[in-house]
């Protein structure tokens, strides 16, 4: 199962691209909007609600500083895939760089 966590509802168009592909491959998913900056307890609640489940992958959708990806990865044992939205190549580079430099606890 894939659990998408968006930083805000403004990320829904980007999330739809992902969920359309998940639907195409028959992969079950659920979607939430919760900011690591503004609603960290809500993010933790989502993670807590799913910690006993099997075969979970988190997809985080947040731009700019993208604390969401690192926050989810650091607080869950499940894989986390950061998939930031972007509007152009410059925005893509900022978002990818931010996603890659966010710290998370190692799995090993």
Task: State what each model feature region is.
Residues 11-16, 40-41, 62-71, 89-93:
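Short glycine/serine/threonine-rich phosphate/pyrophosphate-binding segments
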Residues 1-4, 30, 56-58, 78-82, ...:
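Structural motif
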Residues 21, 75-82, 99-102:
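A glycine- and small-aliphatic-rich helix-loop capping segment at beta-alpha/alpha-beta transitions
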Residues 88-108:
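Short, glycine-/small-residue-rich phosphate/pyrophosphate-handling segment
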Residues 16, 72, 100, 104:
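Solvent-exposed, flexible loop/coil residues
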Residues 46-85:
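Glycine-rich phosphate-binding loop
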Residues 1-36:
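Glycine-rich phosphate/diphosphate-binding loop of Rossmann-like nucleotide-binding domains
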Residues 27-52:
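N-terminal beta-loop-helix "entrance" segment that forms/cooperates
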């Amino acid at each position: 199962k894939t659990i998408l966590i968006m930083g805000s509802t403004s990320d829904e168009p980007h999330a739809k691209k992902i969920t359309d592909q998940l639907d195409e491959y028959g992969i079950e998913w659920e979607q939430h909007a919760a900011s690591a900056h503004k609603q960290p307890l809500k993010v933790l609640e989502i993670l807590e609600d799913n910690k006993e489940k099997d075969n979970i992958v988190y997809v985080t959708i947040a731009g700019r500083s993208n604390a969401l990806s690192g926050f989810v990865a650091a607080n869950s044992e499940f894989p986390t895939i950061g998939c930031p939205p972007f509007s152009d190549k410059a925005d893509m580079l900022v978002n990818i760089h931010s996603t890659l430099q966010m710290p998370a606890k190692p799995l090993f």
